[in-house]
Amino acid sequence: MSDVVQDELSKKQTTRLNKLQKRLRREVGSAIADYNMIEEGDRVMCCLSGGKDSYAMLDILINLQQRAPVSFEIVAVNLDQKQPGFPEHVLPAYLETLGVPFHILEKDTYSIVKDKIPEGKTTCSLCSRLRRGTLYGFAQRIGATKIALGHHRDDIIETLFLNMFYGGKMKAMPPKLLSDDGANVVIRPLAYCREKDIAEYAELKQFPIIPCNLCGSQENLKRAAVKDMLKQWDRQHPGRIETIFTAMQNTAPSQGVDREQFDFVSLKQDPNAEFRGDVAEADLPAFDFMDTANSGHINLDDASKRQGTRIDVVSTFTP
């Protein structure tokens, strides 16, 4: 933290900042360890957009670099896509204060997007694809072994629901990804971090935020709707978002319906199998007692103490 920022923050704000930094550092460290994101000798290319997420990612990675059990390099990279009004001086000035190696690339993808996308339509998808292609190529040029992007936990969950609602796929953003050509490994160190923590951290750190709407494009309405839905859930049902993310880490293909993930076709009964594992329904005395009190629950272990009526088998039929 710079002395300027320290001087401008109150004691309460400084305490809060330190607490947030500790939490984000712990979450980023856990994500890196869980997915083996950064290894000994890695050159990590941190893609910096000028938004709160990428600023926070770079800040935390620099902090972790000083105490990490492995040695790795950090190179910050920003792509100036020639959007009108883009403040070219902001990022270089900020990065110089950090003393971290950086590159500012220039490529006029803005004109390409405006030429291809009809007026009034969202340009974000094409813009991001063009940006990704440029960054992938530059990563190979500078010998980067990892490309770090600033997507956080909320981005990952939003993408899951977007693909479910509009794409018919159970697909999100993986914390670690190998590019289609196998030439680049993409990592998302903020995968365990909440957006609201990042936003508060960025505000307290006073990062020089560059707005992402310089192109004039409106936010993707579908993503905005999903974001609002998740925010409402978070307010009304605290802990639900955490549970969703935990569920994404604990999938059970054999309990789903995706034939590509599990071979249901080949499932056969083993005539020699011995009973083991969970008790089958046939072995439970589910109909030995009737709930005459209509309480909705029968305690089979204590059935003798309850008001119950024995159900007898009075007849059988064999075709």
UniProtKB/Swiss-Prot annotation:
Subunit structure: Homodimer.
Catalytic activity of the protein: cytidine(32) in tRNA + S-sulfanyl-L-cysteinyl-[cysteine desulfurase] + AH2 + ATP = 2-thiocytidine(32) in tRNA + L-cysteinyl-[cysteine desulfurase] + A + AMP + diphosphate + H(+)
UniProt-recorded Gene Ontology molecular function terms: 4 iron, 4 sulfur cluster binding; ATP binding; magnesium ion binding; sulfurtransferase activity; tRNA binding
GO CC entries: cytoplasm
Further comment found in the protein's record: The thiolation reaction likely consists of two steps: a first activation step by ATP to form an adenylated intermediate of the target base of tRNA, and a second nucleophilic substitution step of the sulfur (S) atom supplied by the hydrosulfide attached to the Fe-S cluster.
Gene name for this UniProt entry: ttcA
Function: Catalyzes the ATP-dependent 2-thiolation of cytidine in position 32 of tRNA, to form 2-thiocytidine (s(2)C32). The sulfur atoms are provided by the cysteine/cysteine desulfurase (IscS) system.
Cofactor binding comment, as recorded: Binds 1 [4Fe-4S] cluster per subunit. The cluster is chelated by three Cys residues, the fourth Fe has a free coordination site that may bind a sulfur atom transferred from the persulfide of IscS.
Major location category of this protein: cytoplasm
Places the protein is found: Cytoplasm
Amino-acid positions noted as binding [4Fe-4S] cluster in the UniProt annotation, renumbered to this chain: C124, C127, C215
GO BP, sorted A to Z: tRNA thio-modification
Organism: Shewanella amazonensis (strain ATCC BAA-1098 / SB2B)
HAMAP family named among the record's database cross-references: TtcA
Pathway: tRNA modification
Pfam families cross-referenced by the UniProt entry: ATP_bind_3
Family: Belongs to the TtcA family.
The protein, known as: tRNA-cytidine(32) 2-sulfurtransferase
Protein keywords: 4Fe-4S, ATP-binding, Cytoplasm, Iron, Iron-sulfur, Magnesium, Metal-binding, Nucleotide-binding, RNA-binding, Transferase, tRNA processing, tRNA-binding
